[in-house]
């Protein structure tokens, strides 16, 4: 069974928000709404100190996790929210009645009501691209080269990102999006730094929905459960 997901190497993420901007542009997300959000985790200030004694920080991107057992699908009264064969969770706008039961059941607060269309929207994992063999736009445009896309059933080492974007010399300025298709990619296993699979691979809090997205964070305290 296929389960598409995104892996984010949080040690590489620089918080540039290119993922947020590119997502809004390609999907026509309304002003004030986001399919992809960027959170700054830390530094934390203790109440008995004027300055922080914990200067460690990182950026955490949050979007629809395309869960293995999505609660949004369970509560949808019309079947508008449904799980696809590729593991993604999608919304059939023709069936959506805007009741927002799905948004209320989502533990990550990543669904919103499009007030003009009166339907709920969220990250589609760029179905229009991935169904044609492409990469999600947030992966293709990641400024820190921190995001990778793949099938969990094949292991996170096989997750892919654009290969050309990693060239240090930048001699070629004619790079086109269609070059990001199969044959011109690099895997997380090839590029990623060593990590502990037991202690440095994380998910957002599991509320019985089994989130699919993976976060790798080395040598720092994971605070994504807070």
Task: State what each model feature region is.
Residues 1-226:
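Non-ligating segments of multi-cofactor redox enzymes
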């Amino acid at each position: 069974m296929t389960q598409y997901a995104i892996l984010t190497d949080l040690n590489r993420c620089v918080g540039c928000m290119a993922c947020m901007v590119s997502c809004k542009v390609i999907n026509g997300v309304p002003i004030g709404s986001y399919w992809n959000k960027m959170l700054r985790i830390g530094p934390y200030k203790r109440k008995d100190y004027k300055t922080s004694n914990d200067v460690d920080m990182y950026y955490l991107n949050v979007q629809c996790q395309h869960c293995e057992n999505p609660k949004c699908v369970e509560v949808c009264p019309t079947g508008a929210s449904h799980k696809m064969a590729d593991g993604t969770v999608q919304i059939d706008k023709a069936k959506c009645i805007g009741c927002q039961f799905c948004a209320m059941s989502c533990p990550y607060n990543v669904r919103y009501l499009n007030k003009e269309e009166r339907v709920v929207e969220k990250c589609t994992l760029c179905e229009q691209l991935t169904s044609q063999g492409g990469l999600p736009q947030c992966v293709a445009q990641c400024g820190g080269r921190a995001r990778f896309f793949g099938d969990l059933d094949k292991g996170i080492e096989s997750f892919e990102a654009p290969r050309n974007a990693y060239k240090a010399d930048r001699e070629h300025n004619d790079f086109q999006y269609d070059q990001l298709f199969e044959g011109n990619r690099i895997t997380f296993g090839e590029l990623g730094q060593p990590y502990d699979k037991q202690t440095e691979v994380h998910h957002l809090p599991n509320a019985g929905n089994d989130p699919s997205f993976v976060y790798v964070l080395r040598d720092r305290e994971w605070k994504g459960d807070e």
